[in-house]
């Protein structure tokens, strides 16, 4: 019984695995682009391997579209496919799929240390998570066809995500002018105040966040270090 179950899980997970090889877009030149999605590997600026799902919109021949970068919350993962948990049960995942269906490119990626991405969780460190988000934009500009561009290596970009995924938008948009719009949902400005407003600890939420962090082996001591308390 265990062997068939293991094989089934392996097959299901293989369908969500990111891969380096991209679809051949050359055949679509001068033709309509069909709506589809595929898994991809994007490398952060420090070489960290990030797993991503790219949702390709239906586009008429010659038409272009902006890209929406979707970032998940603490303890979450990317939208791996249209009927995935994050795509059907989480507000930001549903919004990302709505954007895709409305004709936008969408890239949903696992932030470092979460899901299928390598690296360690650095709690929104500008040198790591923020640079990863900018690397996703670099990748989109270099690899996606029919992308609306505002200039060389400057795609028209929006960002969407909740909580932890909202914080990266605030920091990334302050650093990179290529980001044209952000939708940070239920994120924080001052993490200490968010977790313990007026020194009253939110026991429920803090317990959930700490539990999710422990499950990854994350160094929870960073939660109380000054550089990590404010975005």
Language-model-detected regions and their locations in the chain:
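C-terminal motif of bacterial Sec signal peptides marking the signal peptidase cleavage site
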Residues: 13-15
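Gly/Ser-rich "nucleophile elbow"/oxyanion-hole loop immediately N-terminal to the catalytic nucleophile
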Residues: 59-63, 122-128, 135-163
């Amino acid at each position: 019984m265990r062997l068939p179950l293991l094989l089934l899980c392996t097959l299901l997970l293989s369908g969500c695995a990111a891969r380096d090889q991209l679809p051949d877009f050359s055949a679509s030149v001068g033709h309509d682009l069909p709506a589809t999605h595929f898994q991809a590997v994007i490398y952060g600026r420090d070489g960290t391997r990030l797993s991503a799902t790219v949702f390709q919109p239906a586009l008429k021949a010659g038409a272009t579209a902006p890209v929406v970068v979707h970032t998940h919350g603490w303890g979450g993962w990317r939208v791996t496919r249209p009927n995935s948990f994050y795509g059907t049960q989480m507000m930001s995942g549903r919004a990302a799929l709505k954007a895709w269906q409305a004709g936008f490119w969408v890239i949903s990626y696992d932030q470092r240390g979460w899901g299928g991405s390598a690296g360690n969780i650095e709690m929104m460190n500008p040198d790591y998570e923020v640079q990863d988000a900018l690397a996703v934009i670099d990748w989109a500009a270099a690899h996606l066809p029919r992308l609306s561009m505002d200039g060389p290596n400057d795609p028209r970009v929006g960002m969407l995500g909740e909580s932890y995924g909202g914080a990266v938008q605030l920091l990334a948009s302050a650093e990179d002018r290529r980001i044209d719009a952000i939708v940070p949902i239920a994120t924080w400005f001052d993490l200490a105040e968010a977790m313990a407003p007026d020194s009253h600890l939110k026991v429920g939420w803090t317990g959930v966040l700490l539990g999710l962090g422990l499950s990854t082996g994350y160094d929870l001591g960073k939660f109380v270090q000054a550089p990590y308390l404010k975005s």
